[in-house]
């Protein structure tokens, strides 16, 4: 049985990520099923930070297809280079969007989303195999601290792809 996520009583993201990372490593320890692993990681991130939507889109041919997530119903498919997720996939880099209404071609899966961060996950050959997508109802809710920490989370997920 999986142990519950335990966190310090703080809103400081550095402290929260520091406490969460070993717990994510433990969630992934000896878990080889990508669906199970991605489901637990999305739950751990949403539980820790309370973001509106946390989940994964997997590369399937020429589009991203929704995978495990926590939050409201999501867009099912996103084209290469479309929206924030498709752009992060195409450009193979983390994208932080402080105000989604200002992002050209933003795909509004939820009208409540104000800011977003998308982090690519690479396979063993270095190709983008999936993306981690996180939406917040707060404007400018993500910064480089989040980007760096979430990139570390995605590195832990690489062996699943």
Identify the residue ranges that each predicted region occupies.
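Sensory-domain boundary capping and coupling elements
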Residues: 122-136
